[in-house]
């Protein structure tokens, strides 16, 4: 049934200097020898968002691995919001990739998947043979018209006594979620004490000049100017031509030139909810062509 995320959730431990080993939940589906696609979640969600896409990709002949970030989904939660930083998320995700022996995968980088994954791809390109970018950027702390909107959204979200998860996703889709789907997004967070990870994400995003992640992200952006591996952007059509669109990525990254980029109609920010079939088709075609 569509509501079932997966029959085979798995956990590995990533090291942390302060808290010791932390359990990181992930899904691993498809034949072990099949071409690998790494699927990354975003703000407000966990790997449940891939419940429709994973079966389509595995049916098309791919292996899919989808991790929950520390603080999200079925992964361990830290006690305080301040326990998370952008760099720690980078380190945890790199540890996951190393332990899973990820090499030459297709990075399917959605929202925070791109914020973290583009940095990692620039620093250690051996993880990825190609990239699919969805409603994402590499934030470097430089001014952008979209940042003011984000700051206002962040202030509004953090002021809420109950930090929304399922409802956050529901406001970012064109096809409304069912009550059961909203409840599934909320399920890993029995009360507000479990939401330190989601609450911290908007605060640590490197959109300000004084963010400690800015120097490393700027260096990564410079490295991406030399990235020749194939890069495909699949964004919500409403983002095309705006500060949240893919144009800067396409212009900056050599591997993005000449690819079949698309703006998907009738999709919201949580594009994976709205367009799983089209995303599976376009991703399959991209892998076949590259």
Language-model segment annotations:
Residues 34-41:
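Short beta-strand element of the alpha/beta-hydrolase
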Residues 18-22, 34:
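Short acidic/polar mixed-charge low-complexity motifs
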Residues 39, 66-67, 109, 133, ...:
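Conserved SAM-binding loop
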Residues 47-50, 62:
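Membrane-embedded alpha-helices of multi-pass transport/permease systems
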Residues 1-16, 24, 29, 43, ...:
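Flexible "cap/lid" subdomain of the alpha/beta-hydrolase fold that forms the substrate-access gate
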Residues 52-56:
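Typically the conserved alpha-helix immediately C-terminal to a functionally engaged Cys/Sec
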Residues 57-78:
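Conserved alpha/beta-hydrolase
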Residues 267-280:
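Catalytic histidine-centered segment of alpha/beta-hydrolase-like enzymes
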């Amino acid at each position: 049934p569509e509501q079932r995320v997966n029959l085979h959730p798995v956990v590995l431990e990533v090291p942390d200097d302060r808290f010791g080993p932390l359990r990181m939940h992930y899904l691993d589906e498809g034949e072990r020898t099949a071409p690998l696609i790494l699927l990354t979640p975003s703000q407000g969600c966990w790997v449940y968002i891939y419940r429709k896409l994973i079966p389509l990709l595995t049916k098309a002949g791919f292996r899919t691995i989808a991790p929950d970030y520390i603080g999200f989904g079925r992964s361990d939660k830290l006690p305080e919001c301040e326990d998370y930083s952008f760099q720690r998320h980078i380190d945890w995700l790199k540890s996951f990739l190393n332990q899973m022996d990820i090499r030459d995968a297709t990075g399917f980088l959605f929202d925070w998947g791109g914020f973290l994954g583009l940095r990692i791809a620039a620093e250690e390109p051996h993880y990825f043979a190609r990239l699919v970018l969805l409603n994402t950027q590499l934030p470097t702390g430089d001014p952008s018209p979209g940042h003011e909107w984000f700051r206002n959204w962040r202030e509004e979200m953090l002021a809420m006594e109950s930090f929304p998860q399922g409802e956050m996703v529901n406001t970012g889709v064109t096809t409304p979620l069912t009550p059961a789907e909203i409840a599934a997004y909320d399920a890993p967070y029995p009360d507000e004490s479990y939401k330190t990870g989601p609450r911290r994400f908007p605060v640590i995003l490197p959109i300000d000049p004084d963010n400690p992640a800015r120097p490393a992200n700027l260096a990564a952006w410079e490295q991406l100017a030399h990235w020749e591996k194939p890069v495909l952007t699949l964004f919500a059509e409403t983002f095309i031509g705006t500060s949240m669109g893919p144009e800067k990525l396409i212009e900056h990254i050599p591997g993005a030139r000449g690819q079949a980029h698309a703006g998907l109609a009738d999709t919201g920010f949580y594009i994976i909810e709205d367009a799983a079939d089209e995303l599976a088709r376009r991703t399959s075609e991209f892998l076949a062509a590259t």
